[in-house]
Amino acid sequence: MASKPFKRSSVHWVDLDPTRRRELKKTRPALIVSQDALNEALDTVVICPLTSTLHPTWRTRLQIGLNHNQSEIAIDQIRVVSKDRLTPRKIGDLSPKEQAALRDLLSEAYAQ
């Protein structure tokens, strides 16, 4: 498969269906969190879906502004998806400040 230019910290539309139980579903924006070297080498990427339903007290969500809209990165819904599920054209990027906050949140949730 030809490598698509999916980069860490970029946001793309992703088709998450079919899903089960409480997984976030439908076609929605998702943030790529996997390393660029893996994104180039594999046919899959690691993503965190975005949602417009805000949960300010949830410690597994990071609120961001994307294209003048408030969204949350749902790190509790992190998953691996085929690149075929993503649109190649990105719809946004995290700011350096948001990237740092996301790294801290991911580390707190999964590395400690």
Which role fits each region the language model picked out?
Residues 1-112:
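Conserved functional hotspots at enzyme active or ligand-binding sites that engage polyanionic ligands
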